[in-house]
Amino acid sequence: MIPKKTKLKSREIEVPGDKSLSHRSVLFAALSKGKSKVTGFLEAEDPLNTMSAFAKLGLKVQKVKPGEYEFESPGKNKLVSPNVDLDFGNAGTGIRLSAGLICGLPGINATLTGDNSLKKRPMGRIIKPLSSMGASIVGLGEKETAPLKIEGKKLKGFRYESPIASAQVKSCLMLAAISSETDLEYSENILSRDHTENMFRFLGNKIEQISPLHFKIKPPYVLNGGEFRVPGDISSAAFFLVLGVLAKEGNLLIKNIGLNPARTGILTALQSMGAKIEIQNKRIECGEPVGDLKTYPSNLKKSNIPESLIPSIIDEIPILSVAGFFAEGGFEIRHAEELRAKESDRIHTMVSNFRELGIEVEEYTDGYSFDGTSKKSSEVWTRLSTVKKIPIQSYMDHRIAMSFLIFKTLSGLDLQIDETSWIETSFPGFEKLLESCINE
């Protein structure tokens, strides 16, 4: 067995605001005529890039204090074409959702771009259905990738059966329909995150729910300014959940975390592995369930992760894989080919880094598997514990960098991560918070 070494201070912590909700708060503020207020906004590069993009379209932005912003929009029909390209940096959510919204605004012409990593990510998944709605959108990069050139126009009603469970595709098409005041009927095979639907309802709109996987929306839409409170991001909390359950001693109470059922797959997965995590103070805020999460040191074991759970843990699979290394019997993830379309090809990234550590990993087109706390992995750990400066490649991916920082903390290995600046895209202050939890 791999020995548990990490001792934690028993303390309360908070993680930054939910990235998905921070993006969406800007988008709905831009659509809604008048003033909107957001508290708990994630002041990380990705959502700030989305905010900057819509400021160029005519959204007035005022920072009240850290994490709190006031927006004023002239209304969707009075937004203006930007005179420069809209740079979304590394924000896949930002560019895909914004593309849908802008496609439905007649007279608005814009080019949406991003960094080198974003320019490699697939955009055909939104270009095809948007084009079927009548949108003028072209991917100027190879294989329909960004930059995206858009000429906004009035779109037509559309019925779409999504071949993938993707909240980004669903939200993109919803925002296109909302901005263009047209109807949308949407269905998917597995339930994806429903933050856009919740915020849409919170503003006073109705959704005709035909089944849990099938819905309709139709105008007129209610688009008045609102006040949004963004809870802590469970994807960010996931790193500290794994830290807490794999520590030798100490408890963490992670406050004010969004507990949307489409996002709590990480809790289901960890608890099925034997993790003891307690939900406290559960409540509803701005249409989203919120609560506090308390961790207890636990002994983990291998657990089968069903295909139906994959959409709700897709961003947490790297840190869940780290937990799997400490689990009796190891770890296996399948049906997760979507990992290859993230900030990096996360299947390749995790496999190559684990192999660099000497861990035997089986790679599949849709996932990977490896032994956990077996004799063989214990031997690997014993050998690595004497090695200095073991290189880890982050591949410009914030979640890979954070996952291996947690791995480094738990294992005591001298891992040298090539670059950690990517963490700023989602979790500013991560390393400082991590250090503050350790009881030396």
UniProtKB/Swiss-Prot annotation:
Keyword Cytoplasm: yes
One matching Pfam family: EPSP_synthase
GO annotation, biological process: amino acid biosynthetic process; aromatic amino acid family biosynthetic process; chorismate biosynthetic process
Keyword entries, A-Z: Amino-acid biosynthesis, Aromatic amino acid biosynthesis, Cytoplasm, Transferase
UniProt xrefs under SUPFAM superfamilies: EPT/RTPC-like
Cellular component aspect of the GO annotation: cytoplasm
InterPro entries in alphabetical order: Enolpyruvate_Tfrase_dom, Enolpyruvate_Tfrase_sf, EPSP_synthase, EPSP_synthase_CS, RNA3'P_cycl/enolpyr_Trfase_a/b
Subcellular localization, as worded in the UniProt entry: Cytoplasm
Primary subcellular site in the record, as a coarse category: cytoplasm
A GO term for molecular function: 3-phosphoshikimate 1-carboxyvinyltransferase activity
Domain of life of the native organism: Bacteria
Biological role stated in the UniProt entry: Catalyzes the transfer of the enolpyruvyl moiety of phosphoenolpyruvate (PEP) to the 5-hydroxyl of shikimate-3-phosphate (S3P) to produce enolpyruvyl shikimate-3-phosphate and inorganic phosphate.
PANTHER family, alphabetized: AROM/DEHYDROQUINATE SYNTHASE (PTHR21090), PENTAFUNCTIONAL AROM POLYPEPTIDE (PTHR21090:SF5)
Official protein name in the record: 3-phosphoshikimate 1-carboxyvinyltransferase
Species whose genome carries this gene: Leptospira interrogans serogroup Icterohaemorrhagiae serovar copenhageni (strain Fiocruz L1-130)
Gene: aroA
